[in-house]
């Protein structure tokens, strides 16, 4: 007979998950990219977050940089707009902005990117399980005179990727990449344990047989603690990311190692009363330079 956990414990667990401003996820994405917790953003009525870049060099005062980051969220806590800019927004020096569109299941179906090269759209088609089966990358002509306001004109297709999925067994599945001849050229194999934790991803290019492998380890609370990437399995070089958390589950520090050499050290700071993200610090272990992004949150 299986005993149900007391409601108070379930409620505490749910609150701890919601209390985390950031989540660290296993997968193929950039491990150091910010992933905002949608439940936290929605519950705390966060409308936007602005980040200001600063640099601290040895024996020199902190210097504010022109680079800024902007994230906007809908009422469900989803990121609907992001921007990375130099100087004031609208000055013409913005490096990139992205508008996100979601389906009824809360999954991204389109990313509209605007940078100095123009407007580009990533359109994603999904199957009934929510998996990406097609991703089309197009350039959209802007008939308007304002770079930031798209008046759609001609569309030029740049790439059209298709994917298929195969279930190998209860804990293993495979993703295949198809080229324009509908032939597989790459495959990724995902292996989890029986509890659902992703253990490793093996990436193989069919023609060259080049393989890479990424493994994941977790702490006693099921949070991602280590990510080890071997970009080429014929060579011993490895990239290792480590993460540490506080009692509430907030990520508070991270490390990046290239083999036995530590490359950088990350720290995350939060507001004590609200647990809103306050700053992220990245120290280059070779030069000693510290890059700081200081965050300001606007509520609805």
Q: For each predicted feature, which ranges?
A:
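Bacterial N-terminal signal peptides that target proteins for export
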Residues: 1-7
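N-terminal signal peptide c-region/cleavage motif recognized by signal peptidases
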Residues: 14-18
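Buried hydrophobic residues that stabilize the cores of well-folded domains
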Residues: 20-300
């Amino acid at each position: 007979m299986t005993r149900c956990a007391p409601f108070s414990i379930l409620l505490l667990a749910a609150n701890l998950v919601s209390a985390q401003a950031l989540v660290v996820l296993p997968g193929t994405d950039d491990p150091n990219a910010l992933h905002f917790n949608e439940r936290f953003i929605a519950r705390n009525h966060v409308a936007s977050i602005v980040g200001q870049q600063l640099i601290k060099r040895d024996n020199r005062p902190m210097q504010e940089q022109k680079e800024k980051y902007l994230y906007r969220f809908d009422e469900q806590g989803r990121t609907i707009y992001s921007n990375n800019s130099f100087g004031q927004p609208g000055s013409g020096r913005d490096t990139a902005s992205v508008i996100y569109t979601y389906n009824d299941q809360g999954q991204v179906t389109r990313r509209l990117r605007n940078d100095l090269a123009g407007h580009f759209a990533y359109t994603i088609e999904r199957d009934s399980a929510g998996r990406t089966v097609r991703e089309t990358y197009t350039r959209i002509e802007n008939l308007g005179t304002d770079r930031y306001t798209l008046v759609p004109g001609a569309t030029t297709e740049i790439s059209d990727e298709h994917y298929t999925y195969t279930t190998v067994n209860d804990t293993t599945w495979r993703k295949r990449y198809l080229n324009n001849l509908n032939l597989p050229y790459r495959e990724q194999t995902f292996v989890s344990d029986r509890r659902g934790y992703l253990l490793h991803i093996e990436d193989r290019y069919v023609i060259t047989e080049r393989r890479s492998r990424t493994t994941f380890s977790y702490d006693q609370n099921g949070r991602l603690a280590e990510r080890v990437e071997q970009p080429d399995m014929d060579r011993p070089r490895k990239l290792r990311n480590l993460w540490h958390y506080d009692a509430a589950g907030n990520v508070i520090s991270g490390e990046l190692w290239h083999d036995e050499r530590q490359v950088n050290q990350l720290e995350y700071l939060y507001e004590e009363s609200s647990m809103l993200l306050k700053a992220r610090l990245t120290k280059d272990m070779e030069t000693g330079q510290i890059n700081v992004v200081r965050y300001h949150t606007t509520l609805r």
